[in-house]
């Protein structure tokens, strides 16, 4: 059984691999460098809505165990994986046009001490849209964090 650290490492490597596969890595590296140089970003929507970014977000999300867990709309990754790439991108763009997140499904998760903790499970489309946004904002934000703090960094940043 893989440890939590091994799972995190696998996730980081997959993230880098997916970015390279979809041709996003030069874009993400550019965002990081521009942010590091103090650039102010005004219109990121074209990057967020790009087909490459949407497909990378879908691939990243598809690899998560949680993608098989339904949100309040009862949909899972299986409901959207039959869509062709163009249709998937069109639907994400349509939903992002006037984006309002759906309510999350609440689930109580048992803790070892007998108590529970609340877990919010978003709808599959919200997860996909939020992943699209995260992929573009993450390198911009990472460039702003302290150079001596490594707890928040992802593998591509550490390797720079």
Segment roles from a protein language model:
Residues 1-86:
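Non-catalytic, polymerase-adjacent accessory regions of viral genome-replication enzymes
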Residues 35, 69, 102, 135, ...:
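A positively charged, amphipathic N-terminal helix/segment that binds anionic biomolecules
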Residues 77, 102, 107:
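Extended, charge-enriched "interface" segments that sit outside catalytic cores
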Residues 79-101:
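Amphipathic alpha-helical blocks
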Residues 106, 143-148:
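A short alpha-helix capping/helix-loop junction motif
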Residues 110-113:
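Residues forming anionic-ligand binding surfaces in small-molecule and nucleic-acid pockets
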Residues 116-145:
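Conserved pre-motif C helix in the palm subdomain of viral-like polymerases
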Residues 151-157:
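Conserved small/polar residues in nucleotide/adenosyl-binding loops
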């Amino acid at each position: 059984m893989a440890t939590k650290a091994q799972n995190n490492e696998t996730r980081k490597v997959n993230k880098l691999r997916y970015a390279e596969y979809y041709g996003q890595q030069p874009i993400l590296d550019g965002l990081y460098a521009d942010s590091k140089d103090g650039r102010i970003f005004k219109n990121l929507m074209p990057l967020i809505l790009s087909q490459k970014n949407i497909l990378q977000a879908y691939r990243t999300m598809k690899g998560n165990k949680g993608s098989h867990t339904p949100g309040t709309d009862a949909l899972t990754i299986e409901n959207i994986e039959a869509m062709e790439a163009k249709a998937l991108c069109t639907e994400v763009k349509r939903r992002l046009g006037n984006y309002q997140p759906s309510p999350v499904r609440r689930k109580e998760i048992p803790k070892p001490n007998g108590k529970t903790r609340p877990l919010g499970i978003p709808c599959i489309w919200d997860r996909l849209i939020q992943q699209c946004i995260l992929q573009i904002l993450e390198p911009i934000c990472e460039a702003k964090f302290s150079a001596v703090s490594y707890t928040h960094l992802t593998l591509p940043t550490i390797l720079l």
